[in-house]
């Protein structure tokens, strides 16, 4: 296992990654250690942002932002106990259960998303994992969205062997299955699903040649070490995810995490920067929690290497800035949709 200590010592001077060879060395290394990511997170803010922006420019259009839209195609009634989730059946959050949407309803939503500028359409379902009849319905939805010329993504929970292949055959481009947090902190948030279940599902997705969308949530009461552990785990996947959504906890009344102290927004920006440095080719997505961020914090996230957002006024069951707000912010910052 190769350590990043030599690279991090160079980072202290604020010049790391101005040399492309260092970025190549970083990307080709097999693993990130938690201690090394924690050292990144502890850098002076300006140095960390500079390094992240330098890496970002080596691999991406510096001013391009990919727009994705997320739709809940089956809402509420989930049997899991994820402490952050308003869709868990055991919590009283006011979320109404909704049966899986029809093909016509999904096509209508996807058409609207495309007209608003989205290039990727993600469909989420609140269950532990899909049954075969659910997979068959999802393949119809995926094919219909694909026919509109959009990239397709689905987040359906734990996949059984063979299910990912069916989704791939229907035209699925990305499968989302987040790790949520570090292995060490995981048990504080979820007890009904093992961490290994998540890794096994990611293996199923990779085995079907579907692109991986995998990230986590920060602000759940975890330590900086735990945030470093999440990023190290993601960056050490082989290969690391093509898409990395970083969520800022949205506290929903009725969930166990409601009312905990909020994470300092600058710590969220640091997490974005560390994700960019450790996974240079990935799309790093600002996901849930943007509505509670100022425009200035969002701008810092883009500077730190975020180059994707969820676009639309709702993410599953939680609020999101509306498309007009986002369009105005992108224009203000001189950013453009990819």
From Swiss-Prot:
SMART domains, sorted: BATS (SM00876), Elp3 (SM00729)
Cofactor: how and how many bound: Binds 1 [4Fe-4S] cluster. The cluster is coordinated with 3 cysteines and an exchangeable S-adenosyl-L-methionine.
- Membrane-crossing residue ranges in chain numbering: none
What pathway does this protein act in? Cofactor biosynthesis; biotin biosynthesis; biotin from 7,8-diaminononanoate: step 2/2
Q: Print the keywords alphabetically.
A: 2Fe-2S, 4Fe-4S, Biotin biosynthesis, Iron, Iron-sulfur, Metal-binding, S-adenosyl-L-methionine, Transferase
If you read the UniProt record, what top EC class would you report for this enzyme, in one word? transferase
Show the GO MF annotations. 2 iron, 2 sulfur cluster binding; 4 iron, 4 sulfur cluster binding; biotin synthase activity; iron ion binding
Question: Which cofactor does this sequence's record say it needs?
Answer: [4Fe-4S] cluster; [2Fe-2S] cluster
Q: Any one Gene Ontology biological process term? A: biotin biosynthetic process
Q: Which InterPro entries match?
A: Aldolase_TIM (IPR013785), BATS_dom (IPR010722), Biotin_synth/BioAB (IPR002684), Biotin_synthase (IPR024177), Elp3/MiaA/NifB-like_rSAM (IPR006638), rSAM (IPR007197)
Which positions are annotated as binding [4Fe-4S] cluster?
A: 78, 82, 85
Q: Which reaction does it catalyse?
A: (4R,5S)-dethiobiotin + (sulfur carrier)-SH + 2 reduced [2Fe-2S]-[ferredoxin] + 2 S-adenosyl-L-methionine = (sulfur carrier)-H + biotin + 2 5'-deoxyadenosine + 2 L-methionine + 2 oxidized [2Fe-2S]-[ferredoxin]
Annotated Radical SAM core domain residues: 63-290
* Residue positions binding [2Fe-2S] cluster: 122, 153, 213, 285
> What EC number is given for this enzyme?
2.8.1.6
The UniProt subunit note reads as follows: Homodimer.
The function of this protein is: Catalyzes the conversion of dethiobiotin (DTB) to biotin by the insertion of a sulfur atom into dethiobiotin via a radical-based mechanism.
Which family does the record assign? Belongs to the radical SAM superfamily. Biotin synthase family.
- From the Swiss-Prot or TrEMBL record, give the protein name: Biotin synthase
Species = Nitrosomonas eutropha (strain DSM 101675 / C91 / Nm57)
């Amino acid at each position: 296992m190769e350590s990043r200590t030599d690279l991090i010592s160079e980072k202290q001077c604020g010049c790391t990654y101005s040399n492309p060879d260092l970025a190549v060395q970083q990307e080709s290394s097999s693993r990130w250690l938690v201690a090394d990511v924690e050292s990144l997170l502890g850098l002076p803010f300006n140095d960390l942002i500079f390094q992240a922006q330098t890496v970002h420019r080596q691999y991406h259009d510096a001013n391009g932002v990919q727009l994705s839209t997320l739709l809940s195609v089956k809402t509420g009634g989930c049997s899991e106990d994820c402490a952050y989730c308003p869709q868990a059946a055991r919590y009283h959050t006011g979320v109404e259960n909704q049966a899986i949407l029809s093909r016509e309803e999904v096509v209508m939503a996807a058409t609207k998303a495309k007209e608003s500028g989205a290039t990727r359409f993600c469909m989420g379902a609140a269950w532990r994992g899909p049954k075969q009849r659910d997979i068959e319905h999802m393949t119809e939805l995926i094919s219909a969205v694909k026919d509109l010329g959009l990239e397709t993504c689905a987040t359906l929970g734990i996949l059984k062997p063979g299910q990912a292949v069916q989704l791939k055959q229907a035209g699925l481009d990305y499968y989302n299955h987040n790790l949520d947090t570090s292995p060490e902190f995981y048990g504080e948030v979820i007890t009904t699903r093992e961490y290994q279940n998540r890794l096994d599902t990611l293996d199923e997705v990779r085995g079907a040649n579907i692109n991986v969308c995998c990230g986590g949530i920060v602000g759940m009461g975890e330590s900086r070490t735990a945030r470093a552990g999440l990023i190290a785990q993601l960056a050490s996947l082989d290969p690391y995810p093509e898409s990395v959504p970083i969520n800022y906890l949205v506290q929903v009344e009725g969930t166990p995490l409601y009312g905990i102290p909020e994470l300092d927004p600058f710590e969220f920006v640091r997490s974005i920067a560390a994700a960019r440095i450790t996974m240079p080719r990935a799309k790093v997505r600002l996901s849930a929690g943007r509505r509670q961020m100022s425009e200035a914090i969002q701008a810092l996230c883009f500077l730190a290497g975020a180059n994707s957002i969820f676009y639309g006024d709702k993410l599953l069951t939680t609020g999101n800035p509306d498309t007009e707000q986002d369009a105005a912010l992108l224009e203000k910052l001189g950013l453009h949709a990819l």
